[in-house]
Amino acid sequence: NGAYLTLIERKTRFYYMIPISAKSSKQVYMQINKLHKFYGDSFKDIFKSITFDNGSEFSRWKDIEQKPKSKEKRTTVYFGRPYHSCDRASNENCNGLIRYFIKKGTDINTIDKETTIDINNKINQKKRKILGYLSSEELFLNELAKLNVTDNTIFYKI
């Protein structure tokens, strides 16, 4: 049925909504590697840590913590406590926003790339009180500029 791998950057609350063809550890690992390849050495600064829920699709967490070839540490993986969605509240909130656009139970594999990008952009462009009425996108682009990352077309390359 496919699914979305969703990640949220902690400082700016920039949201990643990455389609995966199956809810599997292999798919999650492959998509994290694509993100790492896209951001290069800046990956470790953007994703200092990742908090997953306890689904089996995150069973390759040790592999995710390391760069694929060098096995150098690239991030730290944490797990939320079972049945404590508050451990990942920002992510869960954004996951709820997806439901405005896609009904629960919809096969993600039937949703085209442009629709996914559009939904993701709408979530990231939403002004938020917690961010001083700025959007996640505005703040994230500022952070990328500090890291000298000028290309933010990741969603077009997934």
Give short role names for the model-derived ranges.
Residues 1-16, 21, 32:
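Short conserved beta-strand segments at catalytic cores or DNA/RNA-binding microdomains
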Residues 42-46, 72-74:
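Short helix-terminating capping/connector loops at secondary-structure junctions
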Residues 17, 48-53:
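Short catalytic-loop micro-motif centered on adjacent basic/acidic residues
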Residues 52-54, 61, 68, 76-102, ...:
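RNase H-like two-metal-ion nuclease catalytic core shared by retroviral integrases
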Residues 104-158:
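C-terminal domain-tail junction helix/linker
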Residues 17-42:
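Active-site beta-loop-alpha junctions of metal-dependent nucleic acid enzymes
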Residues 23-24, 34-35, 54, 66-72:
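Active/binding-pocket-proximal capping segment
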Residues 24-27, 43, 54, 59, ...:
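Conserved, well-structured core segments that form or line functional sites
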